[in-house]
Amino acid sequence: MAQMTSGLYPMFGFFICLLFLPASWEAGANTFQELQKTGEPSIFDHLLPLTPGLTRRALSDHKNSGQHPPDLPKSTATQKPKRQCNTVRLVKPVHKPIDDAKAADYGNTTVGHEPFPASEKNLSSQGKHPMARNERSADDHGSTNSEKRSDGGHSTSAPMRKISCKPVTRTSGTPVSSTETSTKLRTTSQKPETSSHDSDLIRKSTSLPVKSTEVSRTSYRTPRSLGAERHTIPFTSDKSIQLTIEHTKEATRSQSTPTKYERETRSASERISRAHVPPVENHTPSAGETTTQVSAKSTKHTEEATTSTTEKATKAPERPTVNLNTTGLVKAMENTSTAPSPHLHKTETAHQGITGSLTSRMDLRPITSEAHHLQQNTHSLPGGLHSVQEREGSNSFPAWAIVVVILMAVIILLIFLGLIFLVSCASRARHQLTQNSEDAEPEDKGGRNSYPVYLMEQQNLNLNQISSPP
């Protein structure tokens, strides 16, 4: 047992070490990535400095020989994580001469570019950090800007070299291939013939910003004459200028057209106002004739209204108040309709007189008709107004109240019938009980099991021989 326990302890410690090793490796890799993002130098930079001169020599030797570099010896034990640096040579695009016809097609500042190989893009995207990628993209933009600023000097620019480092953990049985990646990048970077499709795409992408800059230049050169612009501006910018001029002309025409519509609307409104004028003037004499007739009739109706009852007098002043409001509204509408025309000042007074007479006629007719009906009712009925009021009061009783009263009466009747039935049942039961009691009394008096005989037998007999009572 002691040997088993002594063997288990080292095994347990070994497993714990195996568990902690991946965690420590991940922590070290994270710290190196953070240092690489912030740009702070780490301890391993001082321990493993890379000389760019040696890498350049190795690259040139491998290029001339055309052979792969020898594999490095395999490490037999796990080592601490180190930063593996990949030297990448970014070859700037070379300026090439272009004919005048091609320059006219692409613009005054178009330049032939040598594309970056596709293999270099893939390898750099796999092995480089995002910060290094951003630096490379910034350099690419800087190179394109420098090409645009150049006035046509055809000179090959020197290739740029960059070092992108990343942390690498070396374990047992894994060879380190830093020089292989650098030589592959070098050898593949000088084969632009294999990526012809990519070169066309890059040329198209580089031609787009050139066109955009030319359009922006035309916007600044607009004050100049059109002849000078035709010599300096490309074909695309001429189209844009012509389109803008046409749009401005159309906008000015669209702004000038509403004036025609306004004139038409004004003329139409004047015609409408003129059309409204003659009917009013034609109807004025007939209205004057009707006013005299209405006034004559109104005097008769007012005399009849005074002889009516007190209710007639209370109803009569209520109606004219409502009609006065309507007359005010009619006057306001007439004033608004006749305001535009200056020739209708005389007709307004006639309208006011007509409306006053018409409203008086409309007011007096219903009043007199109601008074006449009330007089007929009072003369025909024996009870007079009191009987009419009583009928109105009786008719005002709601129907749902009648239904409720009927239901309550039915319920009371049912309760009364139930009480009668219960009383009869109780009386019958009591009668039966009285008859049974009367039948049992003679047997108790003259029977064999009477009270004194039972007592005598109980005294004479023993306790064991006593018979139970029936």
From Swiss-Prot:
Residue ranges of the TM segments: 402-422
Topology check: give the Cytoplasmic ranges: 423-470
Please tell me whether the keyword Ligase is annotated for this protein. no
Q: How does it sit in the membrane?
A: Single-pass type I membrane protein
- Residue ranges in the Extracellular topological domain are 30-401
Q: Which residues form the signal peptide?
A: 1-29
What cellular component GO annotations does this protein have? Answer: cytoplasm; plasma membrane
- Which residue intervals make up region (Disordered)? 57-234, 248-318
Name this protein carries in UniProt: Mucin-like protein 3
Q: Which domain of life is it from?
A: Eukaryota
Q: Which organism is it from?
A: Rattus norvegicus
According to its UniProt entry, the function of this protein is described as: May modulate NF-kappaB signaling and play a role in cell growth.
Sites where a glycan is attached: N122, N325
Biased composition range(s): Polar residues: 75-87, 169-193, 204-222, 283-295
Annotated keywords: Cell membrane, Cytoplasm, Glycoprotein, Membrane, Signal, Transmembrane, Transmembrane helix
Compositionally biased residues, Basic and acidic residues: 132-152, 194-203, 260-273
Localization: Cell membrane; Cytoplasm
